[in-house]
Amino acid sequence: MSDTARTGTSDPAADSRSNYDYKSDDVERPGLMADLDALVEGEVRFDTYTRNLYATDASAYQQLPIGVVAPDSTADVTAVMEYCADHEIPVLPRGGGTSLAGQAVNEAVVLDFKKRMDAVLDVDPEGATVRAQPGITLARLNNNLKPYGLKYAPDPAWGDKSVLGGCIGNNTTGAHSLKYEKADGYIEEVEVVLADGTVTTFGWMDAEELHDRAAAVGPDDPLEDQIYAAVSRILREKDAEIEERYPDLTRNVSGYNLDKLREDIEERGEVNVGRLLAGSEGTLAIVTEAEVSLEPIPAETAVVLLTYDEILDAMRDVAPILEHDPSAVEVMDDVLLDLARDTAEFSDLVGTLPEGTNSALLVEFYAETVAEGQRKVADLLADRLPGYDPETGLDASEGAPTTDDDPYAVDALEAYDDEQQSRFWKMRKAGLPILLSRTGDDKHWPFVEDTA
């Protein structure tokens, strides 16, 4: 039975199942595992050990799932969704489990894409796009792209564990959000499974085509058509409200991604419903394949670690540093530096910092040559480091950015070779694992992240 037949309306959000009072006893029945096992080619695990493994993710939350399915294909996902829709059983797509707000745990049938749906399907170097399954880690995806001189730009700290599907679901960005967009800006096309098990593809279409298609949708048309109709109606009727209520932030991922669709219509006269899935955390549809656009790998990078006596000094320096057009600016506070000092892997590096260092800013620049990278660092230090005396012999460039703000940095460590830059970045990206590994009763438990 279609959603419109249940409710008598063309609005998918009015599905009567949204009022279903879910209780675990309603779905924990002997035949559930056997039914799913007969429907899919992948793994179906409902044993206590597996359920306990999937009851946690990188967050502080814990919730025992109903069971776990590792799908082998889009057909498997379709079978699970059709069955669970008919039996009113919640379904939760799971990627790498790296999110810190509990997105990957719930009392549901968990679909684990990382185990079996993790392939690169096609690379188009000329078009700078790649098509891949949702379970591939970002690190492995970029390793596959490196020979082409291309990369998938969103780079969360746990890129060796974060997967493409989760990146889209979370609308991830990363340390290089100064240069690159969030995941939504790279979605070209997605193959998805809808709530009723329908498989469809969302990609670019002319905005007028969307509205014309929506106008022809009737109350008994399939769910896919109802979605187009609902998106069209919301974009038309709520245009002014979307503009007014959505914050003008480069890293806003709260709420459904209606502002991105509105922005695309304004800028290019086109709309991509697939971009609405970015940040939806699997609540709108389940991605089974994604075609995403790519960025060129920079020819060279230069990194400098600016040290400060106080965290507030580092914070005051951020705005002037941004005037120099860095590719990344990342902070390391006294807690992280103190713990890193007691970590064998980073103790030597932290030991080279000036005595009394309370915090540091890792600043990175992209460049075409090593010399250009050195010049950009010299320009920054001439502006932000009092009494800077360049060991490289480089003076600040004529016309280089200078600010009226007082400089606060105490010292600087420069890095132009891959090995030293990697050490700086590894210490920054190891921040959360270092915090979680501290001994004693005092522990860091992340549960609210990236607020402003």
Across the structure, where does each feature detected by a protein language model lie?
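Noncatalytic alpha-helical scaffold of FAD-dependent oxidoreductases
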Residues: 1-452
